[in-house]
């Protein structure tokens, strides 16, 4: 994607839509799913590098969510789970498979 990409504005707007309505991720047409999967793969790799987070397969995690999993307070996210924008997650947490965490939720694992 370059600034000359005619679809750049569309993709950026669609990312915002997915951030707040992540269930739409699984119904994307193949041409849109390709860029969305790469966007998610890049963000999830960054998140796992920065925090003690493990992420299952086929998940959607909004980059506008706040995920804090410092050492000793891990967060595990199961397969086919989505986390929408403006959520705050603070480990330790074990989020199962096929869990929907919609926007503006706060989950705190409490004391370790």
Protein language model regions, located:
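Domain-scale signature associated with acetyltransferase and cell-envelope carbohydrate enzymes
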Residues: 1-112
């Amino acid at each position: 994607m370059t600034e000359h990409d005619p679809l750049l504005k569309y993709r950026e707007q669609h990312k915002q839509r997915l951030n707040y309505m992540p269930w739409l991720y699984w119904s994307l047409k193949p041409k849109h799913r390709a860029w969305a999967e790469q966007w998610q793969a890049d963000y999830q790799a960054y998140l796992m590098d920065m925090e003690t987070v493990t992420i299952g397969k086929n998940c959607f995690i909004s980059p506008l969510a706040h995920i804090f999993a410092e050492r000793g307070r891990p967060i595990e996210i199961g397969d086919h789970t989505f986390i929408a924008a403006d959520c705050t997650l603070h480990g330790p947490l074990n989020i199962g498979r096929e869990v929907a965490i919609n926007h503006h939720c706060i989950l705190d694992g409490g004391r370790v």
